[in-house]
């Protein structure tokens, strides 16, 4: 797994320059409401959580979420003395399932103190090996440090679960971690091919357009515009202290990246342009999941992005 301080990220982002590779995106999605983003359908679309973003480009230090970014790929269950543990190695298919896990620190003792990151102390993600079934959940923690994430219907196959957090004390205080484990959902698994690239898509009647030239291992801006019936959307609502939440997973190994918004929330009037700080460490195809909210309803768009 990985951890990093906010200062290292800022230095790296400020130093990043260069020409960009070709960008290709596929967008497909379905919307829903709620504070978690489940995606039971296995068609590379997704069923939402809650979200939002706007435009503008403040300094790196002023960007929402820019104080919380991590290095690495999120594919390990341990980093710098912290470990993600769980007794759940299998989960049932076709129905809701509770996944329980614990983060341990010094002396293998459960960690119970976590700092807020985008209004939550823990962000939990689940995705199948073919990058379908995306779910973004904010689990609950018991006094003993055991977290419970309520997952919606899971399709058979191999899944990876990610825990994103920042300890508020101990050796990892102020560092951002993303640890992960795999879990199996028994049954006859059918792989869904990654959709072909495109630059726009229809999501619950909204048109999402993506522009940008991200290059592997370098910091680049990425913009998303939202329109409906040919008109710019300007009523995006806040979600997790932003107007949109954007998560990415690399094809083949499920490497994790969180693309951070670069504008501040000013009320229920976000959009139509959403700006992000994109730093994808590896070349190849990435599956992006953009979450935004309007009228109290969450919409989640699935994006296929090729990074050179």
Predicted regions and their residues:
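Residue-level recognition of secondary-structure-to-loop junctions
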Residues: 141, 148-155, 280-281, 292
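Beta-sandwich strand segments
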Residues: 110-114, 170-179, 232-236, 298-302
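Aromatic sugar-binding surface patches on proteins
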Residues: 133, 143-148, 267-275
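N-terminal edge beta-strand
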Residues: 70-96, 198-218
């Amino acid at each position: 797994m990985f951890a990093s301080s906010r200062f290292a990220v800022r230095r790296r982002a400020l130093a990043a320059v260069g020409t960009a590779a070709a960008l290709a995106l596929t967008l497909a999605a379905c919307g829903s409401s709620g504070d978690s983003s489940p995606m039971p359908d296995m068609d590379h679309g997704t069923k939402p959580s809650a979200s939002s973003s706007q435009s503008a480009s403040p300094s790196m230090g002023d960007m929402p979420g820019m104080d919380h970014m991590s290095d690495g790929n999120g594919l390990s269950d341990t980093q710098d003395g912290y470990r993600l543990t769980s007794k759940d190695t299998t989960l049932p298919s076709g129905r809701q399932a509770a996944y329980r896990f614990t983060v341990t620190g010094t002396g293998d003792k459960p960690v119970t103190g976590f700092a807020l990151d985008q209004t939550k102390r823990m962000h939990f993600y689940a995705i199948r090996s073919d990058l379908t079934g995306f779910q973004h959940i904010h689990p609950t923690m018991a006094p003993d440090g055991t977290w419970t994430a309520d997952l919606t219907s899971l399709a058979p196959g191999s899944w990876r679960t990610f825990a994103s957090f920042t300890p508020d004390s101990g050796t990892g205080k102020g560092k951002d971690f993303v640890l992960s484990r795999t879990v199996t959902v028994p049954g006859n698994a059918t792989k869904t091919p990654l959709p072909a690239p495109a630059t726009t898509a229809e999501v619950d009647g909204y048109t999402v357009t993506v522009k940008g030239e991200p290059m592997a291992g370098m910091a680049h801006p990425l913009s998303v515009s939202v329109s409906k019936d040919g008109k710019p959307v300007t009523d995006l609502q806040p979600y997790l202290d932003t107007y949109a939440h954007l998560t990415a997973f690399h094809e083949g190994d499920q490497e994790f990246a969180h693309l951070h918004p670069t504008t501040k929330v000013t009320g229920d009037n976000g959009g139509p342009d959403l700006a992000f700080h994109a730093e994808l460490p590896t070349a190849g195809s990435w599956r992006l999941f953009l979450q935004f909210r309007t009228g109290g309803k969450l919409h989640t768009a699935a994006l296929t992005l090729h990074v050179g």
